């Protein structure tokens, strides 16, 4: 029984969100406390480059609203621009990012995420975890989180992590994890 509890504890603790920096490191501008305001600005909501976990680049993009939410209520055709405003919070390296989504300069949606500045990127507080059945016995869990930063050309970079894990009685293990990113051109 003690061994079983230790095994379950190891699985739960070991299944944290894990971003891969190698896919974005060649075009990443490191954001620090001194240049954190550079993230503020207007960007096109349609990405210009999609990067998968194997560092393959393509023009097939998800769109800004889909990248920040696993279950986006905002369709990519409903918006054409994103404005980001930054507000420092009391905690060290903690910020609130406000996203103003517009279509033809008409405001459509506003939402906010708290973020922590880690390793030159903003780790957003949009972490979601949904479990079905009895996780790792007869079910699984899905986890999602985003982080964002800037490219060397001052464009917006959003990176997502998605994990789907589970199994049947610890015998038949099933699951996968995906890292992917998209870049969005700065307007101003």
Describe the predicted segments one by one.
Residues 16-86, 90-92, 128-131, 142-147, ...:
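Amphipathic/hydrophobic helical signal segments and adjacent flexible N-terminal regions
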Residues 58, 111-114, 124, 137-138, ...:
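Surface-exposed beta-strand edges and their flanking turn/coil or helix-capping segments
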Residues 108-111, 140-146:
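Short, surface-exposed coil-to-beta transition loops
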